[in-house]
Structures are given as structure tokens and as C-alpha cells.
């Protein structure tokens, strides 16, 4: 039995470094890998290799992101670090790099700066709930009172965006000194990682969440009934489970799954990530369509009005060449389908330029199964002009 090999020994968590430019995010990432590598838990990545992040394309948007992985005694981590500010914005909004928690890097020499604020706001909007603060470059500040002051400022800023500013752990250190092999600084990095282990909870596995499957295709099997197929987004489904067909219509259809198939073979249980066909009892072909979802009863509702945090593609990324204004009517691509919606810009925002990120309100012309944290693209005549995430449900 060669099954042992696949056992996950440690829980897996995705984290990333966020914070203002030149405050030391990449240096810290390098320092973490170096300090853990000395304990045999990682491969050291140097600053240059992390900084030369490869380009990736996520939903048509070009993003530079460095991925490093390492382990602590307790966990396995995938850590993302993006070189430029624009890369962070795109990363967080598209969910190209899903973060369970973040390390906010603030230089003690500067204190919170504009991008510190922006990254905290983005974390709040896209649903990163846990932040640990690393106060960097503390070796360059002689005065402890000054450090206390900077720490207070950071805590106040976090509280302003509804994070528990008073309770968030703040670790003081110097990433550069740790990279240079200073023992005290290395101990600070270990303290940081112990804190991340303790403070950022292990995320719920996708299979433990309530069942949800966006419907991609519908067909009829003569004598057996209607099959809805798609990729299971979360949770599990098996024969005998009750599910609801939700979206695009005001009425929710309740049904029971009478068969689950994958690659034309029957399956005991489909789980998150599987592409399956679900045979639905007593459902007419006309009652289910692409763009709806199959879901555990009561777990998701339809909405027409929401706020979204959106990155607007530049001309070079294939986006619009011109700005848009309130009452702009593009399509919003949720799950597997486009629905037209009307945009209302926030007060004080006259127009949105390609390359901007913005929070706006959308009113859809049909109800869609949406929830906070759901990703979508904004499209115009079939081409992507923006990428977003639902930050609030408004109806």
C-alpha cells in the first residue's frame, strides 16, 4: 500500500506579507525562509529570487507574485509576496492568492504610510480576517517610546478598519539583521512565526463547508431525469442529499440528488474540486439552467444589490481605454454566467479610470446567488474590463 505518501502531516495555511513599499516585506519573507531553513523546515530564498517574481495571469490580468513555501513545527505555509503595489491590489481582489491571514510589515522608522492604510482596507474588503504585525527596522530606532508610539498608531489604524487593534499581536524586529545572521534578530523571526502559528487559525477545509456547485450545463437522461453538471465549489454531495436550485429566478426549487456521476462513473460522494453531474429528482429541464447554483438548503440566497471592491483593467491588459461613470451598465460574471448590472459610484468619485481600484454599488437586473467574498469579473461585450469581490450585500 503506497498510500502513506499522501498523508498530510501538518495543516496547511496560506499567508502573505502586506504593507507600504520599502518597509521590508520581501526582506522579511527572505528572512523567514532563512531562519526556518536553518531548522531544516524550509529552503532559503534570497531577496533577489523573491523580488524577481514571475508574471501570472489570473482572469486576464497580469500579476507578479512570488510564492515561497516553508514549514514551522506545527504547520505548512504557502507565503505570497508581491513586488509592486499594483500587484498587491490585483492579487487581493482577484483572489489569485487566497490569504487566510497576513503579516503587516510596518517600518518603525516611518510608521504607517498611505499603502499601509490601503492594504489594511483591502484586507478588510476581501475578507482577510487575521493580521499579525511585524514592526520592522527596530534596530534603527534608539528610543523605545518612539517604538511604542508607532505601535499605537498601527493599532489605531487597524481598529479604524474593524480589526481588533488592541488585541492584534505586534512583533518588533529587524528582517535585515536576521538575514545577516544576528542571533537576536533571528529569535524575533521565530517569535513572529510562533505568533502566526498561534494567532492565525487553521482555515476550515473546503469539504467542511456547506455544499455549493455552480451549474455549468444541464441535460436530460431519457427515463432518468435531469442532470446538472459543474465543479463543486465547496462541501460534499451524495445520493439522497436535499439541495436547492438557487439564482436567476425569485423562486427556489427544492430537490433531492438521486445520482452523482464523475467521468461517466457513479460516485459515492462528490467533494470540493470534483467535476460532477448530479441527477435531480422530479426536476424539469426548464427548472435549472447555467448560472444557477445547487446548494445545501438555506446556505445561500439570491440578491440583486451589493457593494464590490473592483480593480479596473488598463488598456494594456485588454480593458477599457476610457473612464466610466455612474449608471455604467456592464455585465457581471458570477459563477458561470453574465448578468447585467447598473453601477453607482461612491460619493465624491466622479469617474473611474482604467488601472484604478474602487468600491462601488451594483444593482443587478436578475437575482443571483451571491455572498460576501464571492469573486466576479466585470465584462463588456464578452471581454473582461474589471475583476472584483463582493464586499457587502446591500438588499
UniProtKB/Swiss-Prot annotation:
Its EC number is 3.6.5.3. Residues 136-139 are annotated as: G4. It catalyses: GTP + H2O = GDP + phosphate + H(+). Belongs to the TRAFAC class translation factor GTPase superfamily. Classic translation factor GTPase family. EF-Tu/EF-1A subfamily. This is Elongation factor Tu. The gene is tuf. The lineage of its organism: Bacteria, Bacillati, Bacillota, Bacilli, Lactobacillales. Mg(2+) binds at residue 26. GTP hydrolase that promotes the GTP-dependent binding of aminoacyl-tRNA to the A-site of ribosomes during protein biosynthesis. Residues 174-176 are annotated as: G5.
